[in-house]
Amino acid sequence: MNRKHDGASISFQPRIRRGAFFEACWDHGCRNFSVYNRTYISSTFSNPVDEYWHVINHVSLWPVMGERQIEISGDDAERFVQYITCRDISNCSVNQCKYALLLNNEGGIICDPILLRLEENKFWISTSDCDLELWIKGVQINSGFNVQIKDANVSLLQ
């Protein structure tokens, strides 16, 4: 069933984060937002047809505020990151990114993030709309790996 919800609005709640570019998007006319990874993200600034032609004929800058960076650091960071992904990261140099798969015990895909090696023992995992930080902390809790896991609290642009 297709229903129109003309006039629908969204209430901004404190439990949903406003990314670093939220106010700038608002100031530039965005009045349509959606929630992605517990973050308000800008949806449209005018109308979809005008925005399509703008992307085709001009330049667009997209705040991907909902893509969170999970930081894994510590003496065992490389071994732990290798433990949670099936991608061989032994040849991942500092300042290099790799596409990685994180799988559950049955081989199902949990998430397919981009992995960035910032330092020898510091990685960022760029997560999409999933609770990956909680899953990673759950894997680490009794693993014996000496790592720290946290939200890097940065905002990205594409």
Question: Model regions: which residues?
Answer:
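Acidic, low-complexity central loop/insert segments
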Residues: 111-158
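Acidic, proline/glycine-enriched N-terminal capping motif
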Residues: 1-103, 108
